[in-house]
Amino acid sequence: MKPSPYRGPRSQPRSKSSAPSEADIQKALVRYLDDAHLLWTATANGGKRDKRTAASLKAQGVKAGVPDILIFTPPPSGIGTGLALELKRPQGFGKARGRVSAHQRVWLEELRAIGWRAEVAYGLQHALEILSSAGYDLELEPHTGEINDHHNDD
């Protein structure tokens, strides 16, 4: 049977070995942040939007490039008044590492200039390492359904 010409291509379900998306990484990370009882928020800047929604968000003050995670609880290490994380997909699973945009680079630099620790995390494990190095007390036991963002393409 031929596929209907009126339907778009079917999306294939992601296999367990496929690369986690930035959204997958963020969903896993937020559980650690909540468990640590930190004052934090996620920004809703990612994703594609229609022109009308994008224009409305811009009019409301949404800025391009703001990091994905903003932690207002000062890092216990004493480095920075807060911590900003830009989450990117790690390299692996046949996919290239996520790229930092020019707007994102500017935000990271500006946050550092006002005393924030601002980092790019390539995957969940990298994000947890950054948070741990900042002195945050995280429960590092894997959560149920934890994503695996370590994969070697060799």
Language model features with spans:
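Catalytic phosphate/metal-binding cores of nucleic-acid and nucleotide-processing enzymes, i.e., regions
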Residues: M1-D154
